[in-house]
């Protein structure tokens, strides 16, 4: 669904997954700032590495990055309670998406953004429909547009581009 160009906060899970959503959203005419709000990433060194790669890329592109508070204890309270049982993964992921998207929406609302989008749907390993539900749920009380896109088809191009750029590519989503 096309939306008119907005002042948009793009929640980014990592830099490689940001490449294609950012390109496409800029082509749509949105005024974008990137939100790095990912208390799920463990250990802290991995969080910092992904953050540094994203900051370098954003600086090269002339884009602002808004950093959330790194609070793995908040993630543990929200999502860690579901443990590592594979049967609990959908609930754990939902809680993780909720925590991160609520943080992004609260910031967006307080700082004059009109909508929120996320790069989480680039990965074919995520629950895309759950991400849509949580993005809409987080945006609604703030009166923000939930700019949802299913970017799974862009995963191969994001992978190709990030490798061509020599970009750090992690081999796991970040959660413990």
Feature locations, PLM:
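Nucleotide-activated chemistry modules centered on ATP-dependent adenylation/adenylyltransferase
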Residues: 2-176
